[in-house]
């Protein structure tokens, strides 16, 4: 009855056929893998506000949106509070914060330091213009580029199919590709480990693209993108 009333209101306001009802499945609340027992008769229950107060709005929103509306959600309270890579929301947010840290370090490289390390233009202000992306030939760099190129089509499919959970899967895959890239490829010069200036700029540009993409995806699902963690 309520849905019918809302549909009539939408029709009257000039939006015929625009009202959609998407029903989600049950959420199984767990703590350390064990079900949290609730009972209407006994009055024992956990409200959404209580859940958000305990785990935080980012963890709650990300976990609930990370499944298709056709799937039940197993929400383990202790698991989503963990600050390690086993927690998907932490994993993605940490990747964003790590990229921001790299870009801050690049901005702190002075001209004198850059010259000493065999670099001429490493600072963040030097990236973005006239970058030679053809220098990115490492398999991890290519995998990262391919993943970044999926975003536009992904957003369109999420909107078309009412499937925002795909954004969380994409973010986790992108975070994984970034960590693999950063482990395999030196981005900034260090003492005794110079990097070709143009290659460094290209890698910094790739890092910045990851930052922008992760921030956009997290914003789309209503989750913050911290610059420090």
Which residue stretches match the model-derived regions?
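Non-catalytic interaction-recognition regions
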Residues: 1-229
């Amino acid at each position: 009855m309520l849905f019918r009333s809302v549909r009539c209101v939408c029709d009257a306001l000039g939006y015929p056929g625009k009202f959609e009802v998407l029903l989600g499945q049950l959420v199984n609340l767990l703590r350390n893998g064990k079900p949290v027992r609730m009972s209407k008769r006994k009055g024992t229950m956990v409200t959404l506000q209580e859940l958000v107060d305990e785990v935080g709005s980012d963890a709650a929103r990300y976990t609930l949106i990370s499944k298709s509306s056709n799937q039940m959600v197993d929400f383990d309270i202790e698991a989503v509070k963990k600050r390690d890579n086993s927690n998907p929301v932490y994993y993605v947010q940490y990747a964003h914060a790590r990229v921001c840290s790299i870009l801050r370090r690049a901005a702190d490289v002075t001209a004198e330091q850059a010259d000493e390390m065999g670099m001429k233009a490493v600072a963040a202000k030097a990236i973005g213009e006239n970058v030679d992306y053809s220098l990115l030939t490492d398999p991890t760099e290519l995998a990262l580029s391919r993943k970044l190129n999926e975003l536009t089509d992904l957003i369109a499919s999420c909107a078309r199919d009412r499937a925002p959970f795909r954004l969380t899967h994409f973010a986790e895959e992108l975070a994984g590709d970034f960590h693999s890239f950063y482990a395999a490829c030196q981005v900034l010069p260090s003492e005794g480990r110079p990097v070709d200036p143009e290659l460094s700029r290209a890698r910094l540009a790739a890092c910045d693209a990851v930052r922008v993409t992760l921030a956009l995806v997290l914003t789309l699902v209503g989750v913050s993108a911290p610059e420090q963690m």
